[in-house]
């Protein structure tokens, strides 16, 4: 087995799927670790092509020899909730001004999507996490 490469950096970014380019914030974040920026952009765009229109978080591990690996995550819960509720952004005062509604079924659907990234044992627990996020954004959860 090949010897382990030494990790020199871990970069977390949230980038539009299929739309990574060397402009800020991607260029400076990768440049300071000496990563080939265009190589990352091409690999990321190819990996997220099917999810266009979503924001996809990515965790980039940079090694001593300036090579890298990356892992894409599921879109942020807040983004999925906004899309399902049909609102542009959450409420500035979530406990007084409500901006939209979600059904329990929509919560479970989002929970199903986010399941691999959530710290929950089953879909019901994951749906409660999603419902809590929605409430803190000023979106009412029915059911």
From Swiss-Prot:
Keyword RNA-binding tagged: yes
Modifications the protein undergoes after translation, according to the UniProt entry: One or more lysine residues are methylated.
SMART domains the UniProt entry points to: RL11 (SM00649)
One Gene Ontology biological process: translation
GO molecular function term, any single one: large ribosomal subunit rRNA binding
Disulfide cross-links: none
Family per similarity comment: Belongs to the universal ribosomal protein uL11 family.
Protein known as: Large ribosomal subunit protein uL11
Lineage of the organism: Bacteria, Bacillati, Actinomycetota, Actinomycetes, Micrococcales
Gene label: rplK
